[in-house]
Amino acid sequence: MSSLTYLKKYELPPLPYNLDALEPYISKEIIDVHYNGHHRGYVNGANSFVDRVNKILKGEISSGQYDIQGLLRGLVFNINGHKLHSLYWQNMAPAGKGGGKPGGVIGDLIEKQYGSFEKFKALFTEAANSLPGTGWTVLYYEVENGNLQIMTFENHFQNHIAELPILLILDEFEHAYYLQYKNKRADYVNNWWNLVNWDFADKKLQQYMKK
């Protein structure tokens, strides 16, 4: 009989560029606070809940000494926060290396499904600007039927939301833009298009298409 390994902990991935690499569209100050503060906080939060779950599995905490719904909710929230932020960083490229119109397979699929990149961009932007409160706007690939789907969701409490085949992801929590854009979230959304890493999105799409 194999020995139990219990839940493994999460690690903060390295930022794929320097803190100032996304300027002038996203400031160094925002990236520093966002990555070293908020993202690190999700990793630490997830690991704190992992420790508690492992203590339950080991019998160190007995039934009645914890709130299982609160425990699972906190675990999912922090894991999703960590995984979605990891995608968000990779989904952007330094100023001058990102943005523009997509090529490759993703460019062809966008043209085929939406008619033009301009129509897709307008629809994604409209979805992002219509998001109430805080959350995310994403483009994901439906493996079952090959569709590209635009979706918004508030916060990140949803179970396994981070496991969707996400190709593009836009963080719309205030910590992603407020230090620079204040209450002008639409300006942040518009400028984010200058940073989109289409090469990364295209590689992700091709990976999902093989499944």
From Swiss-Prot:
Signal peptide residue numbers: none
Residues annotated for Fe cation binding in this entry: H34, H85, D171, H175
Required cofactor names: Fe cation
InterPro entries: Fe/Mn_Superoxide_Dismutase, Mn/Fe_SOD, Mn/Fe_SOD_BS, Mn/Fe_SOD_C, Mn/Fe_SOD_N, Mn/Fe_SOD_N_sf, SOD_C_sf
Entry keyword Cell wall biogenesis/degradation: no
Record keyword Magnesium present: no
Protein name: Superoxide dismutase [Fe]
Record organism: Acidianus ambivalens
Gene: sod
